[in-house]
Amino acid sequence: MPNLKQVIDVLETLYPLRYAEEWDEPGLIVGDLSHDVHRIVFAADPTSAIIDKAIATGADLLITHHPLFFRSVHETSGLGFRGDIVRRLYQHGCGLWVGHTNADAAYRGVGQAAADYFGLIEIGRASCRERV
């Protein structure tokens, strides 16, 4: 069984963090890299209800498209809803990895999947920022 680091390595090979817009904060938010990953739950948003479902199903990792945080956070005491989400995930041994604008921009990412679905032929980037 792969551990969290191995799963993250695959995710970040497919969806490199360097593809993220400057304002975005994708990647591993919560998790112990040495923990084994048996079950993964996917969702659009890391809402409290989604966290409940991930915990109830025994997920070791929750992968969401939208981030839990858009700005720097200086505490996760559990007093706010984001802190509560981090606390609950940590207590139940469930990691959280976010693939947002990096997943949008990656080859075979969200943008490419949408283009394929709609049968688009001439495809280009909407961002002026050059990718490294």
Predicted stretch roles:
Residues 1-131:
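Hydrophobic structural segments
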